[in-house]
Amino acid sequence: MSLRGKILSVVAAIAAVAIAFVCAQAQIATKSIQFDLRKIGESVYEARSKNGKWPAQIADLEETEYLKMPHRRTMLEEGAFVIVWQQDLDPNPDANRSRVLVYDNSSLLSRFGRVWVCRGDLRIERISTQEMLALNVRRQ
Protein backbone atom coordinates (compact mmCIF):
# COMPACT_ATOMS: atom_id res chain seq x y z
CA MET A 1 0.00 0.00 0.00
CA SER A 2 1.29 3.44 -0.89
CA LEU A 3 1.96 6.16 1.67
CA ARG A 4 -1.07 8.07 0.44
CA GLY A 5 -3.26 4.99 0.87
CA LYS A 6 -1.97 4.44 4.41
CA ILE A 7 -2.66 8.07 5.34
CA LEU A 8 -6.18 7.88 3.92
CA SER A 9 -6.79 4.65 5.84
CA VAL A 10 -5.66 6.24 9.10
CA VAL A 11 -7.77 9.35 8.48
CA ALA A 12 -10.81 7.19 7.67
CA ALA A 13 -10.29 5.13 10.83
CA ILE A 14 -9.98 8.26 12.99
CA ALA A 15 -13.11 9.73 11.39
CA ALA A 16 -15.04 6.50 12.04
CA VAL A 17 -14.01 6.49 15.70
CA ALA A 18 -14.95 10.17 16.07
CA ILE A 19 -18.37 9.61 14.49
CA ALA A 20 -19.01 6.59 16.70
CA PHE A 21 -18.05 8.64 19.78
CA VAL A 22 -20.37 11.52 18.86
CA CYS A 23 -23.26 9.13 18.17
CA ALA A 24 -22.73 7.41 21.53
CA GLN A 25 -22.66 10.76 23.33
CA ALA A 26 -25.87 11.87 21.60
CA GLN A 27 -27.56 8.63 22.64
CA ILE A 28 -26.49 9.12 26.27
CA ALA A 29 -27.72 12.73 26.21
CA THR A 30 -31.06 11.65 24.74
CA LYS A 31 -31.58 9.01 27.44
CA SER A 32 -30.75 11.56 30.14
CA ILE A 33 -33.21 14.09 28.71
CA GLN A 34 -35.91 11.44 28.45
CA PHE A 35 -35.31 10.38 32.07
CA ASP A 36 -35.73 13.96 33.33
CA LEU A 37 -38.80 14.61 31.19
CA ARG A 38 -40.55 11.47 32.45
CA LYS A 39 -39.70 12.24 36.09
CA ILE A 40 -40.96 15.82 35.75
CA GLY A 41 -44.18 14.58 34.15
CA GLU A 42 -44.64 12.09 36.97
CA SER A 43 -44.04 14.87 39.50
CA VAL A 44 -46.91 16.91 38.03
CA TYR A 45 -49.32 14.04 38.79
CA GLU A 46 -47.60 13.35 42.13
CA ALA A 47 -48.12 16.97 43.24
CA ARG A 48 -51.77 16.80 42.17
CA SER A 49 -52.32 13.59 44.14
CA LYS A 50 -50.78 15.13 47.28
CA ASN A 51 -52.78 18.36 47.48
CA GLY A 52 -55.65 18.00 45.00
CA LYS A 53 -54.52 20.93 42.82
CA TRP A 54 -52.50 21.00 39.65
CA PRO A 55 -49.11 22.64 40.17
CA ALA A 56 -48.79 26.17 38.79
CA GLN A 57 -45.15 26.91 39.65
CA ILE A 58 -41.94 25.10 40.55
CA ALA A 59 -42.59 25.56 44.28
CA ASP A 60 -45.76 23.48 43.91
CA LEU A 61 -43.56 20.48 43.06
CA GLU A 62 -41.89 20.52 46.50
CA GLU A 63 -41.70 17.10 48.10
CA THR A 64 -42.05 15.31 44.77
CA GLU A 65 -39.52 12.68 43.76
CA TYR A 66 -38.07 14.90 41.06
CA LEU A 67 -37.16 17.82 43.29
CA LYS A 68 -35.64 15.44 45.83
CA MET A 69 -32.94 14.63 43.26
CA PRO A 70 -29.82 16.84 43.39
CA HIS A 71 -29.71 19.94 41.16
CA ARG A 72 -33.16 19.39 39.64
CA ARG A 73 -34.73 22.57 41.02
CA THR A 74 -31.92 24.61 39.49
CA MET A 75 -32.46 22.95 36.11
CA LEU A 76 -36.12 23.96 36.20
CA GLU A 77 -35.41 27.49 37.44
CA GLU A 78 -32.82 28.01 34.70
CA GLY A 79 -35.23 26.79 32.02
CA ALA A 80 -33.40 23.64 30.97
CA PHE A 81 -36.80 21.98 31.01
CA VAL A 82 -40.01 23.97 30.66
CA ILE A 83 -43.15 22.81 32.41
CA VAL A 84 -46.35 23.79 30.63
CA TRP A 85 -48.46 24.68 33.66
CA GLN A 86 -52.04 23.58 33.04
CA GLN A 87 -55.00 23.63 35.38
CA ASP A 88 -57.43 21.66 33.22
CA LEU A 89 -55.72 18.27 33.02
CA ASP A 90 -57.59 15.07 33.73
CA PRO A 91 -56.30 13.11 36.76
CA ASN A 92 -56.15 10.07 34.45
CA PRO A 93 -52.94 10.42 32.41
CA ASP A 94 -54.39 8.50 29.45
CA ALA A 95 -56.99 11.24 28.98
CA ASN A 96 -54.18 13.80 28.54
CA ARG A 97 -52.51 11.95 25.67
CA SER A 98 -52.39 14.95 23.34
CA ARG A 99 -51.20 17.43 25.97
CA VAL A 100 -47.57 18.43 26.56
CA LEU A 101 -46.51 18.52 30.21
CA VAL A 102 -42.85 19.45 29.83
CA TYR A 103 -40.24 19.89 27.12
CA ASP A 104 -36.48 20.07 26.74
CA ASN A 105 -35.52 23.69 26.22
CA SER A 106 -31.76 24.01 26.42
CA SER A 107 -29.91 20.92 25.31
CA LEU A 108 -27.71 20.97 22.26
CA LEU A 109 -30.14 18.51 20.69
CA SER A 110 -33.08 20.89 21.16
CA ARG A 111 -31.10 23.73 19.62
CA PHE A 112 -30.73 21.60 16.51
CA GLY A 113 -34.47 20.97 16.35
CA ARG A 114 -34.62 17.63 18.19
CA VAL A 115 -37.06 18.70 20.89
CA TRP A 116 -38.23 15.98 23.26
CA VAL A 117 -41.46 16.33 25.25
CA CYS A 118 -43.34 14.43 27.92
CA ARG A 119 -46.98 14.07 26.94
CA GLY A 120 -49.82 13.98 29.44
CA ASP A 121 -49.88 10.18 29.34
CA LEU A 122 -46.16 10.24 30.24
CA ARG A 123 -45.00 9.16 26.79
CA ILE A 124 -41.73 10.71 25.71
CA GLU A 125 -41.50 11.71 22.07
CA ARG A 126 -39.91 14.18 19.70
CA ILE A 127 -42.09 16.94 18.34
CA SER A 128 -41.89 18.82 15.08
CA THR A 129 -40.75 22.40 14.75
CA GLN A 130 -44.34 23.42 13.98
CA GLU A 131 -45.63 21.81 17.18
CA MET A 132 -42.87 23.52 19.16
CA LEU A 133 -43.72 26.92 17.68
CA ALA A 134 -47.40 26.39 18.48
CA LEU A 135 -46.51 25.40 22.04
CA ASN A 136 -44.39 28.54 22.50
CA VAL A 137 -47.20 30.75 21.16
CA ARG A 138 -49.64 29.26 23.68
CA ARG A 139 -47.18 29.85 26.55
CA GLN A 140 -46.88 33.60 25.86
What are these regions (language model features)?
Residues 104-107, 111-119:
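Active-site and glycan-interaction determinants of carbohydrate-active enzymes
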Residues 15-83, 87-90, 123-140:
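Conserved hydrophobic/amphipathic alpha-helical signal-anchor segments
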Residues 95-99, 118-123:
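Short, solvent-exposed coil/turn segments at beta-strand boundaries
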Residues 44, 98, 114-116:
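Small-molecule pocket liners
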Residues 1-19:
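N-terminal Sec-pathway targeting helices
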Residues 7-9, 51, 117:
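Sequence-pattern detector for short linear motifs
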Residues 80-106:
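Surface-exposed, charged secondary-structure patches
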